[in-house]
């Protein structure tokens, strides 16, 4: 059973999407240098279809994607809720999952997702913006996983110039 601790609307986890990122607890990966070690504990509120529906009613018009951050202790439950998000009628959203595992479990239903990030965080390899990262973000189309990790390096080339506050690419 999945529990979530908090959520936020984010702009960088999934390229070109405004994402409702839901942090799931009870992470079994214990990555050295973890940015959210509190998620290693089995804490938070039970994730339910009702809770997801409430979040969609509140934020559905503002977001284009819902991304589960974690959930490696119960990957098939993550897939269940991804399927729910695909079927619900409150707000059409894409679905993503950030997993810290190096690969998906056997018979995992990738058709429930539009995005999946795989790979543990390794301090010496960096995050998705690092050209040396072991992590990969995949876009799922027609049950094929296309690696779009390069998009994070493109995004990191964008910066705000100080004097005019305009975006420079």
Which residues are covered by each model-predicted region?
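Canonical radical SAM enzyme core domain
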Residues: 41-54, 73-111
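Flexible loop residues that form catalytic
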Residues: 39, 71, 120-121
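Structural recognition of alpha->loop->beta junctions
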Residues: 60, 105-125
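Conserved glycine-rich "GG(E/T)P / GGGxP" loop and the immediately following alpha-helix
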Residues: 62-85, 131-133
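N-terminal [4Fe-4S]-dependent radical SAM core
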Residues: 1-23, 28, 36-41
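Single conserved hydrophobic/aromatic residue that forms the stacking wall/gate
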Residues: 158-169
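Short, cysteine/histidine-rich loop/knuckle motifs that typically chelate Zn2+
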Residues: 26, 33, 162
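Functionally critical loop-and-helix segments that line ligand-binding/catalytic clefts
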Residues: 130-157
């Amino acid at each position: 059973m999945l529990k979530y601790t908090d959520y936020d609307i984010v702009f960088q986890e999934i390229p070109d999407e405004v994402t409702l990122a839901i942090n799931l607890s009870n992470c079994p990966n214990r990555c050295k240098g973890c940015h959210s070690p509190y998620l290693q504990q089995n804490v938070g509120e039970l994730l339910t279809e009702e809770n997801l529906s409430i979040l969609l009613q509140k934020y559905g018009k503002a977001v284009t994607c819902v991304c589960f951050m974690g959930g490696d202790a119960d990957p098939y439950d993550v897939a269940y809720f991804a399927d729910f998000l695909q079927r619900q009628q409150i707000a059409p959203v894409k679905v993503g999952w950030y997993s810290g595992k190096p690969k998906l479990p056997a018979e995992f239903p990738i058709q429930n997702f539009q995005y999946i990030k795989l790979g543990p965080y390794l301090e010496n390899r960096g995050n998705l913006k690092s050209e040396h990262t072991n992590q990969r973000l995949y876009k799922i189309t027609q049950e094929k996983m296309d690696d779009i990790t390069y998009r994070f390096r493109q995004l990191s080339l964008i910066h705000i110039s100080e004097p005019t506050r305009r975006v420079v690419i």
